[in-house]
């Protein structure tokens, strides 16, 4: 079984990706379990930040690495919070603080203009100097609610309403979310790419 470092310290992402990767034959180890600190996210896009994180983890551990960079893009805010989703309310902000700031920012935005999309970029590096990383992108369309609903998921899930399902992302079962989400989409693309590599 191939050991691969997961270049994230976000426990929500670790849980979600570990459950999605469970059947693929990869021994996924979170970078925090290997004593790897988070890489500085200096990129201007999800792709740049995911590559930075994967390269950092691969350099330190000597293992192949998978990194995720993801976030929420709100149409009415020109794509914000975007790459700053995890630190929208400040560098040390909690998920709840980020969510509260976003709700306050869009409180006067009318319902028909509350479109948003989650984006996830997954990068796989075979080694730290890999010149051809595998890069996969998934996106998930929804609408921002006016208040939180649901207790599942993490981050902005309680205010991300999925019209086709009639629920917020936080109200979905793990199976429903994995089948629909930006991260589930990106991971299926990554697994297909790894099978064909």
From Swiss-Prot:
Pfam families: Ham1p_like
One GO cellular component term: cytosol
Details of cofactor binding: Binds 1 Mg(2+) ion per subunit.
Keywords: Hydrolase, Magnesium, Metal-binding, Nucleotide metabolism, Nucleotide-binding
Xref: InterPro entries: dITP/XTP_pyrophosphatase (IPR020922), ITPase-like_fam (IPR029001), RdgB/HAM1 (IPR002637)
An example Gene Ontology biological process: purine nucleoside triphosphate catabolic process
CDD domains: HAM1
Enzyme class: hydrolase
Catalyzed reactions: XTP + H2O = XMP + diphosphate + H(+); dITP + H2O = dIMP + diphosphate + H(+); ITP + H2O = IMP + diphosphate + H(+)
Cystine bridges: none
Active site residues according to the UniProt entry: 69 (proton acceptor)
Annotated residues for binding of substrate: 8-13, 70, 154-157, 177, 182-183
Role of this protein: Pyrophosphatase that catalyzes the hydrolysis of nucleoside triphosphates to their monophosphate derivatives, with a high preference for the non-canonical purine nucleotides XTP (xanthosine triphosphate), dITP (deoxyinosine triphosphate) and ITP. Seems to function as a house-cleaning enzyme that removes non-canonical purine nucleotides from the nucleotide pool, thus preventing their incorporation into DNA/RNA and avoiding chromosomal lesions.
Family of the protein in this entry: Belongs to the HAM1 NTPase family.
This protein's name: dITP/XTP pyrophosphatase
């Amino acid at each position: 079984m191939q050991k691969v470092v997961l270049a994230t310290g976000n426990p929500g992402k670790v849980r979600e990706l570990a459950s999605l990767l469970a059947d693929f034959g990869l021994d996924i180890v979170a970078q925090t379990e290997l004593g790897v600190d988070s890489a500085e996210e200096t990129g201007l896009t999800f792709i740049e930040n995911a590559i930075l994180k994967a390269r950092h983890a691969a350099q330190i551990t000597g293992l192949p690495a998978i990194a995720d960079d993801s976030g929420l893009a709100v149409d009415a805010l020109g794509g914000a919070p975007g790459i700053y989703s995890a630190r929208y309310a400040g560098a040390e902000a909690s998920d709840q603080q980020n969510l509260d700031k976003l709700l306050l920012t869009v409180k006067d935005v009318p319902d028909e203009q509350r479109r948003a999309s989650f984006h996830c970029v997954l990068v796989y590096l075979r080694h730290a100097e890999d010149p051809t990383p595998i890069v996969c992108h998934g996106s998930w369309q929804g609408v921002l609610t006016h208040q939180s609903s649901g207790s599942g998921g993490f981050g902005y899930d309680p205010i991300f309403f999925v019209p086709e399902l009639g629920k917020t992302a936080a109200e979905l079962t793990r199976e429903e979310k994995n089948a629909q989400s930006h991260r589930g989409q990106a991971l299926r693309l990554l697994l297909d790419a790894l099978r064909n590599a």
